[in-house]
């Protein structure tokens, strides 16, 4: 059992009872001074559809290709959580959904773990001059037209310089709210983003 830093004995039961009492007391506060919640009549409301497409754990798969077997992954490969995969397939789906919904009615996001996982991304990190200098996943994501991407833990596998090469080559904002630059004390990249979309109603 840990020592109580307050120097007093406080049981869990007493703490819960006190918290409950404080919570009930707060509900009795006079709210007459508060601004009324504005209401909107049904006649002024309109609806619109916003489609969010998100990818995660791409792990360097630009194509649905097994570089070690030099062949496409079989559709029912039991070693994978889903089949098929690859940014090339994502691009096909994104193009189709944008055509159906309207391009500005679609938000395209990636949740990270992107720049590591295949011989292609290894080559991009270790010998970029062999692939035209651009980070390969940034190039692929730029062609798909992502609106934003997040940093995953595997973005650090090849070092900070490679992470920032991806960041600099990526046209979409790269977001991360929980990694701080120790030199500046500031977030490594921007932590959030507001997107403006003109959604057809």
What kind of feature is each model-predicted range?
Residues 2-201:
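Acidic, metal/ion-coordinating pockets
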